[in-house]
């Protein structure tokens, strides 16, 4: 499909341009030439402070945005296809809420001295481990119920209920927590691509790429599922096996991104629809790579918008993502009604 290939190439160019812009823009604007020299290792005529800003702050943020955006977007695409629900997203199963509960247990019960942006190594690992365990605990429940409930709609409802239970527990923890603990948790809940330092980038990237590769293995089964479960079974697709693999990959990607970046909103829900509108196809052979690229582009764009105030501060990520995501979802709902 020439159109799909062309759009993927365009999205790649846009992603590279936004990646460079992420390295240039911030509280201090750094010339593109100096950024290139820093990345190439030619730092002889570059300010040491600029080198530190690019290598220790902006580069990991940009890489995190690419990986997180691609991961959440693919999760949304797989869930929307598998459940034939245009409003399905990574948070629909309560995975984000499970991760949030894990972080709340660390931040609120252990004195509230931790924050995602600035912690000791042990504290940072504790936050990440708690988020990951919480998210995967929810996934274990979803796996269990998927063996009992065959209806896609009922499984979605169960996921929503699990999310409500987790959010209720978080509210109780906030009620009994200290002011410092509540503030610390709120900062994490705002979402940020700045929570992954270069020290942890290898771990984050390895797990995320592993999940993305796993999602690519589902392209053919997802195309079959578009025609209905019965048709897919006639083609030899093991529906239960595909569903379990899909839930595992979705859980892994959502857990790792939420643990490192907080509960990032709307990217998983809106980006698959943006990709569909661009390609005007449901063929996952082209749609899935385009969704990954589109997710990375949207995440990089949001990160640039977050730093636009410059020296005045950084806008919370979850204050920006709805600006892009909400209009897309409203358009999809109106189109579905027609």
Predicted regions and their residues:
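Alpha-helical transmembrane segments in inner-membrane proteins
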Residues: 1-338
